[in-house]
UniProtKB/Swiss-Prot annotation:
Protein role: Binds to the sigma-S subunit of RNA polymerase, activating expression of sigma-S-regulated genes. Stimulates RNA polymerase holoenzyme formation and may bind to several other sigma factors, such as sigma-70 and sigma-32.
Family of the protein in this entry: Belongs to the Crl family.
Keyword field contains Electron transport: no
Name of this protein: Sigma factor-binding protein Crl
Places the protein is found: Cytoplasm
Organism: Salmonella schwarzengrund (strain CVM19633)
Gene: crl
GO biological process, one term: positive regulation of DNA-templated transcription
InterPro entries: Tscrpt_reg_Crl, Tscrpt_reg_Crl_sf
Length: 133
């Protein structure tokens, strides 16, 4: 499949995979890509498959000359589902912001190398962490 930008989707998936353990190929559809990060374990006592994590997820949409994004902070539960929740622990929020910024920089640099822009979605108004200058 070729995206609106003219780039083959399979090649983009490979490039996105090289950015780190963020892309969830099974949740990517058409010109939309899904990334997430399990940044902080809520409680290490349960067995690994039963653990919950604080983290973030990002949806990326390919358009003709740019990719747009929207992201959310929240809880990745033991069933493997994301829920948007407020996080009140300063250290956790700082870690989420750090990992999101690190990923955003890598993603932006990759897209720039392909002559594509990375911008917030037009309807993404409540951006908790400012990522674009």
């Amino acid at each position: 499949m070729t995206l609106p930008s003219g780039h083959p989707k399979s090649r983009l998936i490979k490039k996105f995979t090289a950015l780190g353990p963020y892309i969830r190929e099974g949740q990517c559809e058409d010109n939309r890509f899904f990334f997430d990060c399990l940044a902080v374990c809520v409680n290490v006592k349960p067995a690994p498959e039963k653990r919950e994590f604080w983290g973030w997820w990002m949806e990326l949409e390919a358009q003709e000359k740019r990719f747009t994004y929207r992201y959310q902070f929240g809880l990745f539960d033991k069933e493997g589902n994301w829920t948007a929740v407020s996080i009140n622990e300063t250290e956790v929020v700082e870690r989420l912001e750090y990992t999101l910024r690190e990923f955003h920089e890598k993603l932006r640099d990759l897209l720039i190398s392909m002559e594509l822009a990375l911008e917030p979605s037009d309807d993404f108004n409540d951006e908790p962490v400012k990522l674009s200058a």
